[in-house]
UniProtKB/Swiss-Prot annotation:
This is Sensory neuron membrane protein 2. Disulfide bonds join 316-384, 345-411, 386-400. One of its GO terms (cellular component) is plasma membrane. The keyword Glycosyltransferase does not apply. It comes from Anopheles gambiae (African malaria mosquito). Belongs to the CD36 family. PANTHER family: SCAVENGER RECEPTOR CLASS B TYPE-1 SR-B1, SENSORY NEURON MEMBRANE PROTEIN 2. GO terms for biological process: sensory perception of smell. The gene is SCRB16. It comes from the Eukaryota. It is a multi-pass membrane protein.
Amino acid sequence: MVQCTLIWAGIGAMMAVSGALLGWVVFPRAVHEKVIEATELRQGTDQYKRWEALPQPLDFKVYIFNVTNPYEVMQGRRPKVVEVGPYVYFQYRQKDNVRFSRDRSKVHFSQQQMYVFDAESSYPLTENDELTVLNMHMNSILQIIDNQAKETITNFRSDVNNTLEKIPVVRVIKRIIERTTPIQSILQLAEDETYDSLRLINVELNRIFGRPDTMFLRTTPKQFLFDGVPFCVNVIGIAKAICKEIEKRNTKTIRTMPDGSLRFSFFSHKNMTDDGMFTINTGIKDPSRTQMIELWNGRTTLDVWNNRSSGLSSSCNKIHGTDGSGYPPFRTGVERMTIFSTDICRTVDIKLTGSSSYEGIPALRYEIDNNFLHEIGPEYGNDCYCVNKIPKSIVKSNGCLYKGALDLSNCFDAPVVLTLPHMLGVAEEYTALIDGMDPEPERHQIFVDVEPYTGTPLNGGKRVQFNMFLRRIDAIKLTDRLQPTLFPVIWIDEGIALNEDMVKLIDDSLMKVLSLLDVVQWVLIGVGLLLAVLMPTVYFVKRCRGEGSRTVSPAVTATTSAASLSTVAGVTGDRSK
């Protein structure tokens, strides 16, 4: 009995130790190796197939600010806008031109994007809803000409002269004027005087933009976002020369049509196109760099933001991080991560704010860091973002924008300003000038929930708003009464929420395995400790009871014998009597 009890106690102790070793040493190592194997980018693996073509489309939601008082704004009144949306699109992503390095540690690729309208999720809204929005292309072109008038006029003067020289009658008249009159031509005057140059543009506005009576545009989401708003249609003379200069700028939101006209659209340049050549780390040599960008278009830096006075590239131009579609594994304890976004030509830091869950899967919540759209300037150590490309607008004395706004002029080749949706966290210098902004951190903040073992994004949203300054422009009569305003145009929510199939995949391949390993660990430890403690306890209890029985038995026997003798003596005495 003693030997059997001790054997069971020993087995229990061994089980407890085994459970501890398995749970805290063996299982973690095995899980670590399996996670690395599952997250590396190797051709032919399931992970590679999911990376090459996202197993589900992203949600691309667009909210458009409809202007309810356009004619009042033209008279200098405060603008009133109403958010209309979401207009929901499926965003499909497919890797093309995939090529691995010799050692397989890096992979080069481009990524095609395609947008398809999701009528069901957008209902009751449709792509053909009529809305009044800021005429972005006209406003942009006028501001660019205002800021660079002499340069612009000089460029298209030669185009106009060449055009006029091809017309025989004009050529003859021009020669006569040059011989008989010392007066300068209109084009020469335009070249010398900025104000007169703008007056020249003012005359041609109707031909270029189709007789606008406000700085706003009546359009549809389909036209404004993808199909394009036409302008520069059937233009001649100076208007044609101006349109040629617009075309030469190669602004990505403006494209040339077969008939020579131009079209502006917000996202047509993103549809059925790629956003450059990426080189990322496969994680084979260093799992901590899985999917980290090594090069974009063959470079490690941009030429968008200001560089250091020494000429060296600034931190603002540095390309690093992932593209946001995936992160390296083992995120537990990682306080910050970085995303590089080609849409806004910069990297963005996100910081750990706590834990969360998605469809029962534990996750880490990361949100945008305060320095993303915080104060900009030399005193904050980030003056490389102060490109000072939007003069005559509402800016600080050093030319930088106020808190919460970022000048994307160099990125868009147009005076576009980035904020968070509804100007969340934006300085009062901007928010006080417009009605209709209703910022809500939970709805308008950038965030992502990441599964900590694999680095898989479970749920998240990249939320940004695009704005433009609307202001008076000298010599452009249409803008005479405008008050300077940072005007909201659209905001987008580009996000991911894993579908049922992907949730099941993670649950089956990871969560259930981890749960099973936990059960095995704690069953071994629990049963082992129970046996190790219970068996000796049972043994000692039984032993104590056994000793107690042996001690009590002689006393009982003696008492019984004495009682018997007394009884016998009593009986004998009675008989004597």
